[in-house]
Each structure stands twice: as C-alpha cells, then as structure tokens.
Amino acid sequence: MRVVIAGGGTGGHLFPGIAVAEELKRREESADVVFIGTEHGIEALIIPREGYPIRYLRSEGVVGKSLMKKVRAGIQTVYSVFDSGTLLRQLRPDVVIGLGGYASFGPVLTAALMSVPTVVMEQNSVPGLANRILGRFADMVCLTYHESISFFAKHRTYITGNPVRQGIVTAKRESAYDLFGLERGKFTIFVFGGSLGAKKINGVVCGAFSYINDIREKIQFLHQTGKSDYDAVRETYRKWGFKGTVTAFVHQMGNAYAVADLVISRAGATTLAELTAVGRPAILIPYPYAAGNHQELNAQKLAEMGAARMILDHELDSETLAKNIRDLYESAETRHEMQRSSRSLGKPDAAQRVVDIVMSLLRKDRKAV
C-alpha cells in the first residue's frame, strides 16, 4: 500500500498528516508513505527528520497577497498541477490525502482527475480556499468541527477530530525537564506563536517581565521565538534575569506540553487539538488575520468551556498578559479546572478515525476494480 500525503506550509497543516502517517505505519508496517510539499514550507525541515520521503513541487498561496503576488501564485498553482501529474505517475499511490493549504491543491486535484482515491482533511471551523475547492472532488472529507459541514457534501463528510502525533500524548514530564534544561519544581510557561513564531507574542511576553518581576525566581519559561526574533528575545531574558530556555524552534512538542503548567500561544486548530489531547491550561491569542477569522472562533470554543483564556490581538498588551499569568500562577484550582475542561474536549483518537476512513475507501476502491 502506497499513500501520498500532500500539504504543509505551516505546522498546523503538516503535523496532522504526520499523525496519520504514524497510524498508517502502526497498522501496516509495510505501508509506503510519501509526502509531497514545497521546498519553502516547514515540511522541508520536518519530514526528513521524521524519516519519511518527501517530493517537492512548485506552489504558493494566494490568500492575503498583493495583486502581483496573486498572479505569480496563480502561475505557480498551474505548475503545481503539472508537477503533481508527473509525481503521481511516478509514485502510483493507492490513495492521496490532502492536508489543506496551497501545497495540497495540485496533488489532490490531479489524483481525483486520475481516479486515484482522495481524502481531504480540514482542521479549521472555516475551511481554507484550497479545501473548499478540493472538497468538491475528494471522495471523503475529514473534519475537526461540526460547523464545517455546511461547506461540503454531507454524504462524503465525517467528523473525526484533528489528528495528533503520538509523541504529543506519550511524552513524560520528568524527561522533558532534562531535555530542555529546566528546573524541577518551578512553574513552567511554554510560549510559542505557531510553528513559524509570532513577533507580537514575543514582544508582549518580554514586555510582561516588568509586571511579574516579583515572582521571577518561582517561574521559568520555554519560549519558541521563530528565527527572526531569537537573538532579541534571548537577550531580553538575560537582561531581566528570567530563567528558562529560549529556542528558535521546538522539535519535541510533546515534551514541551508535558513540562508546561501553562501554555501561551496562537489558536490554530492543530495547536488546540494538541492542547486538548493533553489537557493543558492555556492563554490563547488568536491570529487576527486568519482566513475566516477561524482562530478566534477556535479559541472562543475553548474559552466558553473554561479550558482556556482568550485575549484578542487588539486587546493584547504586556500588562494584560502579565495579569493573566499571575492569576493562573496563583490559582492551582483554576488551572486544574481548565485542565479538566481541556481534556474533555480532546480527541486523541482522531488519527485512528481518519485512517479508518482511508482504509474503508481503499477497500471500496479494490472491490470496484
């Protein structure tokens, strides 16, 4: 069995695909899983580390771009369809799984036109442009949220939840302390702005130090900055004397969640799936320019259920963030309630559900032959 998993660009699209690949290999060790993505997406960094082969095509996103960049992206999309045809004829997959985003468009569309079984995964409550189009061609669509059903044909749509990698749920707190060089017994805050970092979150967290300086010796941070802010953020930690580990990118996300007493992050669907799978209290800061405002909608669900606190980007400042950090640091009871609510929302078996659908599609296709 050969499975092509197409997409990436950001961790939010890519990591659910890795979770599905893990489950496929768990069920059928001989399964051949190949990823397709772009050389400038996060998949070029992550997939080789995960041990899967990856093939590249030409593709760029069009949403939120200037007119000239949209024209360029449109041309690249045409190229991606031609590239996909070449790759799929070489790989001869039994099924193609699309993860959403621009890198999935060419492979899934081409597979559908070649009568190769296709599955599309949609992580957000408001589907992106690529999946809205691909949903018309795909054999099956796997959704995270019920609200997404209206965008797709109901008879081909399944609510599976958003797949989470096994390493997210199996990581242990004790080993995570050693991995990140953190002190046992200190209140640990994990900060990240998504797989690519977030300049505003980095700045506001650093600005909060002056408001929580009195508890400096009792807390520590694990802070993923992204490449561009790494040096400046690290220097700010040194200047204020706050303890912790500052890194451009965290590869061991499961360990990062395991060691955290509190998470401060954006509200991408994959981040929320991981948070709820492990039940971590969080302060969520939705990215304000996400398509369809889906991050705010995602975060609002958790906030309403008591699993997280939400601070909108336009309301975010260092003093507000510091107040929330202090409140949650001082109230173990509140954190425990948030943890319980978060776990109740998690779907740690989402990868199994998606693979069930993939396998049923393959069985149906084989019967038809």
Regions found by a protein language model. Give the residues of each.
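Nucleotide-activated sugar donor-binding and catalytic core shared by glycosyltransferases
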Residues: 1-369
